[in-house]
């Protein structure tokens, strides 16, 4: 989760306010296939802001859609790249004619999706996420309630994104070591 927030903060000053003018999907899929209408929805849309929910980057677009990016384990966003590397899978150009962004993912564990922002609460990747650990929604009582009835080892339970959203293996291991 902290890594995704760092990426969000890094992309925001470069991409917020930019209009997507070109998209080059250099393969039909990452972890999952790209939506059929991915390029058509993106081209001409302005990135109004970039949010984060759990491990997902949410690019809020002017056309009423949200473009979602999950980095997986090895996904990287680079602004200003020509995108000619072997693992540069998605290349974007923006309205100033000079700005570019590239999504690179050596292992292709990341993925992208696009959906109508008004339907976000029903979106399959986001609808069942639990509270994030650094928000006011996360309390000892909420954690207790979300763990109630779990029969798995505590590490597996904490990695379940329905219980606590945004925790990965490294953070859960550190939490359990310190507890």
PLM feature spans:
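Structured catalytic/nucleic-acid-binding cores of DNA maintenance enzymes
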Residues: 1-179
């Amino acid at each position: 989760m902290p890594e995704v927030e760092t990426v969000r903060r890094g992309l925001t000053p470069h991409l917020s306010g930019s209009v997507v003018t070109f998209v080059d999907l250099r393969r039909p899929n990452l972890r999952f296939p790209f939506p059929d209408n991915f390029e058509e929805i993106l081209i001409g849309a302005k990135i109004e802001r970039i949010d984060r929910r759990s491990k997902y980057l949410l690019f809020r677009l002017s056309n009423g859609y949200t473009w979602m990016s999950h980095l997986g384990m090895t996904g990287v966003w680079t602004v200003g790249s020509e995108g000619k590397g072997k693992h540069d899978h998605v290349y974007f150009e923006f309205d100033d004619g000079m700005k570019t962004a590239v999504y690179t993912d050596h292992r292709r564990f990341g993925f992208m999706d696009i959906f109508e922002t008004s339907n976000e609460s029903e979106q399959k990747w986001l609808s069942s996420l639990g509270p994030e650990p650094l928000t006011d929604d996360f309390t000892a009582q909420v954690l207790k309630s979300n763990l109630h009835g779990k029969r798995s080892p505590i590490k597996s339970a904490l990695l379940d994104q329905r219980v606590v959203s945004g925790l990965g293996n490294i953070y859960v291991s550190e939490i359990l070591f310190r507890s």
